[in-house]
Amino acid sequence: MQRGKVKWFNNEKGYGFIEVEGGSDVFVHFTAIQGEGFKTLEEGQEVSFEIVQGNRGPQAANVVKL
């Protein structure tokens, strides 16, 4: 599992990016966020996640808020 901080997340569009220290930013879609109810992330929030290869490159999967 990787760890990072949410760079930004757009609730209306349902996606954003996670900053990884020493690495490239990783795309995150709301469907990758674990948990119940409305799935969103806050700027600066710490998360753990896996990186998978999506249609447009690397993206976050199994995102857990820390």
UniProtKB/Swiss-Prot annotation:
Domain called CSD: residue spans: 4-63
Pfam families (alphabetical): CSD
Induction record: In response to low temperature.
Summary of the function given for this chain in its UniProt record: Affects cell viability at low temperatures.
Keyword annotations from UniProtKB, A to Z: Activator, Cytoplasm, DNA-binding, Stress response, Transcription, Transcription regulation
Organism: Bacillus caldolyticus
Assembly mode: Homodimer.
Domain of life: Bacteria
Gene name per UniProt: cspB
One cellular-component annotation, GO: cytoplasm
Protein name listed in UniProt: Cold shock protein CspB
Gene Ontology molecular function terms on file: DNA binding
Cellular compartment(s): Cytoplasm
